[in-house]
Amino acid sequence: MRIIKPSFEIWDQEEGLEGIYKQIERAGRVCYKSEDKITEDSAKEFVERMIKSGHGAMLEHGTVYLKIPYGTMDDRGEFSNEPIVIKYIDNPYSVVMNNSENDYWYITSNYRVIIENEWIDDLQYLCEPTEFHAKRITVHFVCDRGVSHKKFVA
């Protein structure tokens, strides 16, 4: 029998799309016990395999921060980029904030939302998190298997 000392580690996501890929790969490799296969350029290929095989749960670990300008206002008083934002407002796994002082919407979501809804074009608005984004973190917990299967009630 091996005694496991409980611990945790906060995983910061690196910048850009490559950072999203690396975060997803790291979580997936821990899950599949293949951390030794991580290389400097293995992340994108790993993510593509997860998508192809339908293992979307790993994609949730890749945080996507978008910064979308309001755009131009039409004669009905609606902004040109509003349809892009509304789909995230309607998505339960995304958080939309706005700042009327600088005319931007700030969206926090995850890569699974982007892939499963075929919103890949929205990555043109990819940015680093700002003070206006809802912040997401990934925490790696090490604990006894029995503890990991318990339901905790606050």
What spans do the regions from the language model cover?
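A conserved ligand/cofactor-binding region detector
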Residues: M1-A154
